[in-house]
Amino acid sequence: MSEKRILIFYGTRYGATEGVAGRMAEILRENGNQVEIFNLKDLPDDKIPEFSNYDGIIIGSSIKIGQWTRDVKKFVGNYSKKLNEFKGKLGFYVCSGYASDPDNYEKVKIDYTQKACEKLGVKKLDLYDAFGGLMDFTETSRMGWLEKRILKTVGQMTTGEKAEDNSYHDLRDWNQIEKFTLEFNKRL
């Protein structure tokens, strides 16, 4: 199998989506591919690589209050025509705390990937999935005080358990992420 060229674009708020993008890049490189990874927040439009030079594109976004990051939404909306015309494989994923709940998983997967892409004009998704997120209540968390308080309250209402101050909960299923990435690699 010859080396494939893959782009990974992501938008992250608290680091969950960034961590997934990094792990996907590692897996794809371990399988003999060349991977370029970009946080859309730091990527000006004039620096976006030409899609036709690549065999695959994966796009990831965190979900907060039912919304993608602003940068991913703008990117997908602005490049929907090019993404639909892209000859390679297109993958999409989201990271959301709700996706870690088996009762919500399918709804999150469909609503925040396939349906959300369709609303922005992207009809071509070869593979998509939803992964859990992070609940980081440590002092070094990217979350602000109010966000931590809201998440703790919502978490206690839904699980009946109180999240401790300075606790860290990784709700991502790394086996699921590896399976998604290997399936994407196989489809290239």
Residue ranges and their predicted role:
Residues S2-E3, G19, E30-N31, N53-I57, ...:
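FMN-binding flavodoxin-like domain, especially the glycine-rich phosphate-binding loop
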Residues I8-R29:
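Short, charged N-terminal beta->alpha structural module
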Residues F9-G11, F38, Y93, F131:
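Short hydrophobic segments within beta-strands
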Residues Y14, L43-D45, Y98, D136:
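Surface-exposed, flexible loop/turn segments at secondary-structure boundaries
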Residues N31-P44:
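A short beta-strand-loop structural module common to alpha/beta enzyme folds
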Residues D46-N53:
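Short amphipathic alpha-helix with an adjacent loop that forms part of the alpha/beta core around
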